[in-house]
């Protein structure tokens, strides 16, 4: 059975979608990744574009509240990974059954300024950094998945 992972960022607009898509792509035989936000916003088109460069399409993804995920109790998560600032992460609900809670800090693409090309370049950099973290996570945890 696949272990479930929930990635959380503030608006569920970029970082958490990027991480969930990359984990499902890289290690989907072991994990089922989901994403949510503290205050769901709109899916960031730069995140969509940056992942399309890797052949991953998240254009149909919807944003959702971590509190709605928590209240629905549809999933028992083995890992909850926050991707916002530590102080923002403290506002996340406690999920029953969570084996491990991790915090990965990455810049928010919604806060990038400049031209479209400059913001896309910075977003691609965030995607690369998240991708490296996902690769490390898979190397570390795939060996422990039954």
Describe the function of each predicted region.
Residues 37, 84, 105-107:
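Residues at the C-termini of beta-strands that transition into short coil/loop
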Residues 88-146:
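Phosphate-binding/catalytic loops
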Residues 73-97:
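Mid-chain, well-packed structural core segment of small domains
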Residues 1-71:
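Conserved active-site segments centered on acidic
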Residues 34, 79-81, 102-104:
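Hydrophobic/aromatic beta-strand patches that form the interior of the parallel beta-sheet core
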Residues 45, 64, 75, 117, ...:
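Generic alpha-helical secondary structure signal
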Residues 49, 77-78, 127:
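Alpha-helix boundary/capping detector
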Residues 71-74, 145:
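Alpha-helix termini
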């Amino acid at each position: 059975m696949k272990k479930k992972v929930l990635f959380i960022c503030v608006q569920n607009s970029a970082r958490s979608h990027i991480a969930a898509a990359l984990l499902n792509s890289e290690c989907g035989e072991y994990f089922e990744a989901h994403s949510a936000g503290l205050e769901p916003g709109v899916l960031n088109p730069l995140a969509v574009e940056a992942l399309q460069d890797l052949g991953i399409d998240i254009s149909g993804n919807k944003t959702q509240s971590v509190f709605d995920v928590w209240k629905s109790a549809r999933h028992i998560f083995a890992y909850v990974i926050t991707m916002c600032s530590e102080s923002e992460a403290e506002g996340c609900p406690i999920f029953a059954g969570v084996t491990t809670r991790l915090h990965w800090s990455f810049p928010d693409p919604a806060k990038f300024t400049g031209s479209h090309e400059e913001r896309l370049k910075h977003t691609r950099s965030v995607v690369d950094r998240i991708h490296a973290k996902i690769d490390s996570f898979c190397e570390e945890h795939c060996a422990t998945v039954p």
